[in-house]
Amino acid sequence: LPSLLVKWNVNDDFKVRGSFTQTLSRPKYSALVPSVNIKRSDNEITIGNPELKPTVSYNFDLSADYYFRSIGLISAGIFYKKIDDFIVDQVSTNYEYQGNTYTRFTQPKNAGNANLVGVELSYQRDFSFIAPALKCVGFYGTYTYTHSRVEDFNFEGRENEKDLSMPGSPEHTANASLYFCL
């Protein structure tokens, strides 16, 4: 699928990157198979969906990176993603199938379209700026803020709720680690 990647070396320590990409994610084969899996012990049924469409996304990213003279960097970026036909598991209760009622029914569905916008910040630095003996010890941390909004939510029995966020898309994520080399 098409993509455009641009990098501008402002100077030796400062880089700006931008990109547009289109990506396609096909459904898992197990989700496409028109199979029926009945778990009698829990009275659950799972049915595949051969009608699933691939998820297509249009992605715009812009970032700026500053590299320290010693090992490390600070980076900030923004992103926007338009996602079409994302897939989630639709779960229903008291579902009737071939004359039996099951307490839980699960089937993958194309749930609709979503827009995602966010900010990413990251920082990595060894501690040699404190003391040269600490050149093999460092810190790495990231923070991401994401706002998502689902449009055209396609679930049976549910209305398109206002300001519904995309499933599996947390608003805040962060990671931090200390590292050392041997």
Language-model segment annotations:
Residues L1-F14, N37:
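Signature of Gram-negative outer-membrane beta-barrel scaffolds
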Residues S3, I47, E171-N175:
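Transmembrane beta-barrel architecture of outer membranes
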Residues L4, G18, L62, A76-I78, ...:
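Membrane-embedded beta-strand positions of outer-membrane beta-barrel proteins
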Residues V6-N9, Q22, Y66, R125-F127, ...:
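Residue-level signature of outer-membrane beta-barrel architecture
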Residues K15-R17, T21, S25-P27, A31, ...:
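Membrane-embedded beta-barrel scaffold of Gram-negative outer-membrane proteins
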Residues Y29-S35, D42-E44, F86-T93, A133-K135, ...:
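Outer-membrane beta-barrel translocator domains and adjoining extracellular loop/strand segments
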Residues E44-P50:
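Short beta-alpha connecting loops at secondary-structure transitions
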Residues Y80-K82, N100-L182:
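Gram-negative outer-membrane beta-barrel transporters
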